[in-house]
Amino acid sequence: MKAPMKKLLIALSCCLAGMSPARAHAFLDHADPKVGSTVKVSPTEIKIWFTEGVILPFSDLKVLDASGKEVQKNDKHLDPAHPDVLIVSVPPLKPGKYKVSWRVTAVDTHVTHGFFPFEVSP
């Protein structure tokens, strides 16, 4: 390889090595209650932080009890200051196991989905 080309490739490699990858799609970052956690007091809402903003009309967040019945209220919304945080209220939850199921369309228009458990155990 000729010296000028080799220097160019080395310089380009150094530049690219310092770049961080762009985030793509809205993947679950963290949640409240925490994924897989046991809480002593029923939460009043479920909050999920995603790795990028989501489009509310094309996103869903459900909370299911152990029998598979939906228990969330009909007030799904985004945090006004953080379009990557999806929130839904829940009534006082009885002790037991619950599953949070989500399906979101990210601002990049890609759809992701998943679920996680948590438990209420006073």
Where are the language model's segments positioned?
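Bacterial N-terminal signal peptides that target proteins for export
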Residues: 1-9
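Bacterial N-terminal signal peptides
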Residues: 10-18
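Sec/Tat signal peptide C-region and signal peptidase I cleavage site
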Residues: 19-24
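Short N-terminal segments immediately surrounding and downstream of signal-peptide cleavage
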Residues: 25-43
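Extended, polar beta-sheet/loop recognition surfaces of beta-rich domains
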Residues: 39-41, 45-52, 109-122
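Extracellular Ig-like/FN3 beta-sandwich strand-entry sites
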Residues: 43, 95-97
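Short, surface-exposed alpha-helix to beta-strand junction/turn motifs within ectodomains of secreted
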Residues: 46-47, 52-74
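Short, exposed beta-strand-loop hairpins at the edges of beta-sheets
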Residues: 90, 94, 101-117
